[in-house]
Amino acid sequence: MSDNRTKVRLLQKQVWRKGLVSIRVTKPEGFTFTPGQFVRLGLDIEANGKTEYAARGYSLASVPSDPFLEFFIVEVPNGLVSPRLCALEAGSELWLETDL
């Protein structure tokens, strides 16, 4: 697990078609990046009475001057993270890992 995790909040979700969404999340103070750079989005997942952390890599679709971070998420059938990301609603919290 990354030591450089930051909680972010889902601002907006756009469903483009079944299995494809874009999400916009809060941009951490001072966060800089290059367009197309990969980061990891993670969730605390409840399973079998325990909470486990899982994350996957995603490419930033926003530009550095945007006040938010945007990602396109393709849902992987039976995946651990992408179906949960696609199901999130505005206001939900998730983790951003930036030390890739």
Feature names for model-found ranges:
Residues 98-100:
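A short, basic/flexible loop-to-alpha-helix module at the beginning of a structural domain
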Residues 2-92:
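Ferredoxin-reductase
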Residues 95:
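Low-complexity, rRNA-contacting terminal tracts
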